[in-house]
Amino acid sequence: QEDLLKQNMMSSLLEKETLLREIHHRVKNNMQIIASLLRLTDFQSGNPEVHDVIRDCRNRIFSMASIHEKLYQTDDLAQVPLGSYIRDIGNRIILEFEMEDGQIHFRVDENQPVFVDISTGIPIGLMMNELITNSIKHAFPDTGNGTIQVQIGRDRDGQSGMIRYHDSGRGLPDGFDPDNQTTLGVELIRNLTTQIQGTVTFESGSGMTCTLTFPLKKTPDSHDTVIGEET
C-alpha cells in the first residue's frame, strides 16, 4: 500500500509538471501572437513614429515571453539562469533594431551563476529591455557604434544580487535625476525596482552605468542561489 501511495504521488507530480510546462509554452506562444499582430499593424501603418512605438512594445513582449520559453525548457520549471536570459533579450533587441553585424558589441559576464524565478525574472528582463533600448537609441548618436556590457554577480556577503549595466556612449544628460524623470523608460525601471525590493543607481563617466541590486534567497536544491520571493 505504501508503494502504491508513492506511485500515485509521483504520477500526480508528473501530471502537474506536464501541465505547468504546457502553461509556460502556451503563454509564450500567445505573447508571440500578440507581437506578430503588432508587426502587422506596423506594416500597414507605414508611419515611422508608429513603427518606433510598436517596435518598443514588441521588445517588451519578447522580454516577458523569453522567460516562459526558458522555463518551458528547464528541468525544474521554477528558475532560469539570469545571464542566459539577459543575453537572449539583448540579442533580440539588437536584431529588432536591424543593427549591422558588429555595430553594437553586446556581452554578458557572470562573476557567479545566478538564477531567477518568474516573479523576479520578468521585472529584471523589462528593466534590461529599457536600458538596452535607450543605449541603442541615445548613447551612440554620432557613429551608431558602441559597446554594452552587463556584469552579473553578488555582493560580498552573498545576500544581494547585482547587475552592473554599462554602455560606452555619451553618458547621461547634465542634471539627470532619475527620481524626477517622467519618461516611460525611467518610470518603468523605478517601479520595477521597487517591485523586486531592489535599489538602482545611475552614473555618468565614459558612458552610462546603471547598477541594480536586489535580495537573494537560499534554496536547498542544486542551484546555489535563486533570486525571488519566498514561497
Task: Identify the meaning behind each predicted range.
Residues 145-158:
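Short beta-strand/loop element within the Bergerat-fold HATPase_c
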Residues 55-62, 66, 79-96, 151-153:
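Short beta-to-alpha transition helix within the HATPase_c
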Residues 158-186:
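Glycine-rich/acidic phosphate-handling loop/turn and adjacent ATP-lid/helix
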Residues 38-52, 75-76:
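Short acidic helix/loop segment immediately C-terminal to the autophosphorylated histidine
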Residues 1-13, 17-20, 24, 31, ...:
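Amphipathic, heptad-repeat alpha-helical coiled-coil "signal-transmission/dimerization" linkers
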